[in-house]
Amino acid sequence: MVLVKICGVVRVEDAVLLDGVADYIGFIVEPTSPRSVKPEALRSLRDAVIKSRPVLVTATIPPKEAVDIAAKNEIPVVQYHSTLAPKDFDYAETRGVTLAPVAVYKPGIELKQLVEELLKTPHEYVLVDADKKSQERYEGGLKIPLTLLAEVAPLGRVALAGGITPENAQLIARLNPYMIDVASGVEASPGVKDMNKVKALLKAVGRL
């Protein structure tokens, strides 16, 4: 069964609706994102999540600070979109937080090799995502070539992201990854989730 993470949740009412529907729910604390929430807003969002596993997502906050914010708000996972050092994993463990490192796809990168290296870390999962600045589109509107996703999907606890929508999710589900990660693909507007799209996504990956 493919797990599902819905990311970029900014409204408590969406967190309530998604709780127990998505396996993971992501809260972005990142000034560069249109779906960013302030750290002080995390507690109310986190408290709305009882059945799903909450995740703090960031890229530019220093790893130690991100882990501290997560621990303070009882968020067990930090998905980190920049470089992590061994000491960061060690520190996260002392705070009861697990890191989810990210392999960012750019044309020409040895994606499989990068994912294999990240899988050697004490990870919650390894996310494969596209460069946020990239405008490239591949099969079904995906931001990463399907052939490359097929190479990394069976390697371990690998989550796939990058342009996934209810319309193309079946392409990803056929690869049987550990998880798919979707934000804008199930939205009415940035940060506002559309439950009809969420249900369509779940149906596309065989969860409904």
Swiss-Prot record:
<keyword id="KW-0028">Amino-acid biosynthesis</keyword>
<comment type="similarity">
    <text>Belongs to the TrpF family.</text>
</comment>
<keyword id="KW-0822">Tryptophan biosynthesis</keyword>
<dbReference type="InterPro" id="IPR001240">
    <property type="entry name" value="PRAI_dom"/>
</dbReference>
<dbReference type="GO" id="GO:0004640">
    <property type="term" value="F:phosphoribosylanthranilate isomerase activity"/>
</dbReference>
<dbReference type="InterPro" id="IPR013785">
    <property type="entry name" value="Aldolase_TIM"/>
</dbReference>
<keyword id="KW-0413">Isomerase</keyword>
<dbReference type="InterPro" id="IPR011060">
    <property type="entry name" value="RibuloseP-bd_barrel"/>
</dbReference>
<dbReference type="GO" id="GO:0000162">
    <property type="term" value="P:L-tryptophan biosynthetic process"/>
</dbReference>
<dbReference type="InterPro" id="IPR044643">
    <property type="entry name" value="TrpF_fam"/>
</dbReference>
<keyword id="KW-0057">Aromatic amino acid biosynthesis</keyword>
<dbReference type="Pfam" id="PF00697">
    <property type="entry name" value="PRAI"/>
</dbReference>
<protein>
    <recommendedName>
        <fullName>N-(5'-phosphoribosyl)anthranilate isomerase</fullName>
        <ecNumber>5.3.1.24</ecNumber>
    </recommendedName>
</protein>
<comment type="pathway">
    <text>Amino-acid biosynthesis; L-tryptophan biosynthesis; L-tryptophan from chorismate: step 3/5.</text>
</comment>
